[in-house]
Amino acid sequence: MVLTHNVLAVTFGVLGNIISFIVFLAPVPTFVRICKKKSIEGFESLPYVSALFSAMLWIYYALQKDGAGFLLITINAVGCFIETIYIILFITYANKKARISTLKVLGLLNFLGFAAIILVCELLTKGSNREKVLGGICVGFSVCVFAAPLSIMRVVIRTKSVEFMPFSLSLFLTISAITWLFYGLAIKDFYVALPNILGAFLGAVQMILYVIFKYYKTPLVVDETEKPKTVSDHSINMVKLSSTPASGDLTVQPQTNPDVSHPIKTHGGDLEDQMDKKMPN
């Protein structure tokens, strides 16, 4: 029975490494597009900064497990390297506002935040207690990472556009979450299994939204000048639904000009009457 658990743990751990590696590479088409256009368009840096911080946390957590966390260390070390490249590319092609915003989040979260966690854990906790504290922090932040696409999902629902929610990323995130869920169950690690339940669920919801809106029949027109450019400018401004005809016809109807034959009114009556009164007999 113990051997079976070990085999399952190694199997799911290796599969988790392979699938997670594919997940880390999923945004490559996005960054190829960014590099070609030399613009971040509507894409954001927050998912990549968050993913980097999450990988750093899991490495620190795995180091507390005395060799049992080797498979967690390997994939998250690779993740740190890949996410760092993404962030560098994002900063390179971002406008000034997005660049400053990204650097602020990176400094506060990945440097000051991570340093604070290490200091607290090293100075105030020991042994199994440190593992529990770190595990709780990892679970909490992983839930936040998995919940981050909720804002993207809101934009997809509002705009009926899946342009900024790549299907490949949603698919592999779902598969990865399921794999790590089973890995956590196999090694009986509550902290690894729990957040991946939420990850699998949200990933499935994203794929459903993609299928629904990929072939949406009445796409809305995006104003190129109003596309989000920074992390804070997340909403994609579209033509309001209330101004779109129910039939889906987006043809702009010309406004009817006022009837020039109608006399112009003034406080004293018709303009024509006023002029007549002022004309000499």
UniProtKB/Swiss-Prot annotation:
Key words, A-Z: Cell membrane, Membrane, Repeat, Sugar transport, Transmembrane, Transmembrane helix, Transport
Region (Disordered): 244-281
Intracellular or extracellular location(s): Cell membrane
Membrane topology: Multi-pass membrane protein
MtN3/slv domain span: 11-97, 133-216
Keyword field contains Membrane: yes
Keyword Repeat: yes
Extracellular side: 1-6, 64-70, 126-132, 188-192
Transmembrane regions listed in the UniProt entry: 7-27, 43-63, 71-91, 105-125, 133-153, 167-187, 193-213
One GO biological process term: gibberellic acid transmembrane transport
InterPro entries: SWEET (IPR047664), SWEET_rpt (IPR004316)
Topological region Cytoplasmic: 28-42, 92-104, 154-166, 214-281
One GO CC annotation: plasma membrane
Biased composition range(s): Basic and acidic residues: 267-281
GO molecular function annotation: gibberellin transmembrane transporter activity; sucrose transmembrane transporter activity; sugar transmembrane transporter activity
Chief location: membrane
Annotated Polar residues bias: 244-259
Function description: Mediates both low-affinity uptake and efflux of sugar across the plasma membrane.
Assembly behavior: Forms homooligomers and/or heterooligomers.
Stated family: Belongs to the SWEET sugar transporter family.
Name of the protein in question: Bidirectional sugar transporter SWEET14
